[in-house]
């Protein structure tokens, strides 16, 4: 299995609406979904081949976007590496009892807590709270990654005259939370080498694009850079157990979790 990194640089305020948005604030996600990346390249392919509404009849189009390639979400890149969603098993000390002697803001992986500690208070991580957001690995340590956002006030105007005047007597106000410009996010396209070679040939190395909400006005300008084809790193196991971290929701279908995970880690070792 091979991969191609996709580097997305935010050039203007960008809003990728969060599904939990409510009220007068439209919140943004802190990452760029793989479906967005696939949509950008699919749109570019349709335009360059002048396919219009008949794209689904094009064999090459279906092979690239509904075949063996998988488009992986882009997460913020840092000097320490590319971040990823913090696993739910990571717990941070909020108000643990003093007798546990946990330092303030200590982060513990609950998956290993019962192996590392010999008292119930420490094993159960009482007074701990889940770590949210994104982290990056630096050797054996992990560090939180802050995605820079800001909020801007907008007003909707009900008539053309009010739009020209720049004011409104009966419009509504709303707020957009957006990703700040000049941040870099890295995702990838994963699949067989032959399919990736076909993918890379179809597009220029650098692309201008617009993503997210209000992308036809002042939001969403980004640049994308397509990297080289490289092997997907294969982890090795030095012990008798494998720790599987899910970056995205897992759909099992009719298979068991044991069979799905077993198949995924089969190449790592016995």
Q: Could you tell me what each predicted segment is?
A:
Residues 1-270:
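Basic, Gly/Ser/Thr-rich N-terminal segments that form RNA-phosphate-binding interfaces in CRISPR RAMP
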């Amino acid at each position: 299995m091979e991969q191609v990194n996709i580097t997305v640089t935010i050039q203007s305020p960008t809003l990728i609406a969060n599904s939990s948005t409510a009220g007068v604030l439209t919140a943004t996600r802190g990452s760029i979904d793989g479906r967005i990346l696939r949509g950008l390249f699919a749109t570019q392919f349709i335009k360059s081949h002048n396919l219009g509404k008949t794209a689904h009849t094009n064999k090459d189009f279906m092979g690239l976007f509904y075949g063996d390639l998988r488009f992986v979400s882009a997460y913020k890149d840092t000097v320490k590496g590319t971040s990823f969603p913090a696993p739910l098993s990571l717990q941070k000390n909020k108000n643990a009892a003093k007798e546990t002697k946990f330092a303030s803001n200590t982060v513990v992986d609950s998956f290993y807590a019962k192996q590392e500690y010999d008292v119930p208070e420490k094993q159960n991580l009482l007074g701990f709270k889940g770590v949210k957001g994104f982290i990056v690995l630096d050797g054996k340590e992990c560090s939180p990654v802050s995605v820079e956002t800001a909020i801007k006030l907008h007003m909707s105007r009900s008539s053309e005259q009010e739009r020209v005047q720049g004011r409104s007597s009966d419009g509504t106000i709303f707020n957009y939370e957006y990703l700040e410009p000049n941040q870099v996010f890295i995702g990838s396209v994963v699949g067989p080498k032959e399919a990736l070679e076909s993918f890379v040939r179809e597009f220029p190395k650098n692309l201008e694009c617009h993503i997210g909400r209000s992308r036809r006005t002042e939001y969403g300008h980004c640049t994308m850079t397509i990297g080289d084809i490289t092997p997907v790193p294969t982890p090795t196991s030095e012990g008798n157990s494998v720790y599987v971290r899910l970056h995205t929701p897992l759909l099992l279908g009719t298979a068991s979790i044991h069979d799905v995970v077993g198949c995924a880690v089969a190449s790592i070792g016995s």
